[in-house]
Amino acid sequence: MLDTQKYNALDLAQPTNFRAMLQSGELLWGTACRIPHEEAARIIATLPHHFCFIDAVSALLSFKSCEKLNGKVKEHAPLNATLLASLIKTVQYTSNGSMVPYVRIPEHSSDLVNYALNAGAGGIVRPHVQNVQQARDFVRLAKFPPLGGRSYPPMALFGRQTRTAKGRTVYDVWNEHAAVLCQIEDVEGVKNVHDIAQVPGGISGPHAIQ
């Protein structure tokens, strides 16, 4: 069985090499944190799974949140950046790097890409990718130059958190370790699947397509 910790960076503040894990050919087991609360994430992180899916698109609301809707029950809502970063770090640190947090990002929330990756997410997923340009734009947001246009975060890591192998930088680690996944779940996306597949990192949403 694959050992996730062998794919860890030199510090848990940096993302685990989820790309290499996905390309290893080994069977990976995953779970999901559907309750957007640090305590739920802490409990889930004790499980023996390889990765944990955190859905920033349609997180379940707490009972307290539902009460504020004046009797109108709303099943889900997007996560805010602070809670998202906290869930990612909780999974990463509580599991001691044995479970990779990866996140589905809302289509029009490019700022959450930075928050998720800066927090240490091993991968990000964009829903409803319909054409190659959307896929390229998503990769550009997630990768530092020369692979993309992501802005360098000067305050994301401090001290020992910046440790890397000789000749490497934390930006190399982010570029090489974080998986960028495109979720295809529309007719237009299926029509353009061959072009989208040319962009590194692709995953289809079979349940959505059905």
Residue ranges and their predicted role:
Residues 111, 119, 123-210:
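Conserved anion-binding
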Residues 17-54, 60-62, 75-78, 88-91:
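N-terminal capping/small domains of soluble enzymes
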Residues 33-47, 107-115, 187-200:
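Short, acidic/polar
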Residues 12-15, 37-38, 63, 81, ...:
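Structural motif corresponding to alpha-helix initiation and N-cap regions
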Residues 1-32, 164-176:
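N-terminal amphipathic alpha-helix/helix-capping segment at the start of soluble metabolic enzymes
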